[in-house]
């Protein structure tokens, strides 16, 4: 976690100014002395990994002041300023919680780069996911990635978890970091969320509008659900179970993006947590493993080559993959969020037999002499037709 530290070893007195919680650029009191747990000595490590002792000078914001007991205001420490290149939610997102790390401080930069070298040498990691990327200064993140990639002599994959429904915020972050890391396609997730709750009234022709999958496909990490959006989480935006197979077909069987499968969607899950009504709720997550395995099989063997889209109908979409010399067999995908439907689509294989690997529709489809076929799906469902 590059944005903050918590659970320090000692209190420290600092000069700081309290700021408004909902607009952190606005001071709500004078500069004053506070006491916060900003000293991190890590006594158990005994300097083995780093000689840096973290103190108040290495943080720009804190979320505690123990001089008056119970003071949980946000304080900007003297003489720090908030970064200007981060997202401007709450005036600035240069603070998430606890003790916010000042990545402009040279000692902080050196220590985080040293950690990058250590984690590379110790684990052989082949990539990084930056949780809460909205709270990180893009310029330092870019510098850190360049350093660690040069050190490792590998093109380490990197993805930022930047929870913004507005795709323009993601474009801005990508631009600021020079395209050094991919981004979670949060706008696509919200399109799935809305479509799943629209009762068949969502215009599927617009399912990719305003998404990285459509606008920057080589930097889009696509997902259906994750730990942020699942039930009872702070950013709850559930994709309803009936729609998840349609959504997974879209991220796994198209050429755009780097798809992720959520553990809870694959294995299912069960937990109890507190809802917004402050009452406990029992949650069961359905396993979609049967169909996800079918999609993964189709992705491996058939989702190759040119892609033709058939997005003319508001309730029924389709696309085809025509194959490559190494993976010559074709595939046709058709899905509907309302009544069952069909798409007349080209697969480039004349007089060829196709079967539905999802097993939703029995029987076979044969293409005509021009390589076109009538591929069907059931209502609120998806079928994946592959060359026999």
Model regions: which residues?
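Active-site-adjacent "subsite" loops/lids of carbohydrate-active enzymes
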Residues: 53, 76-123, 133
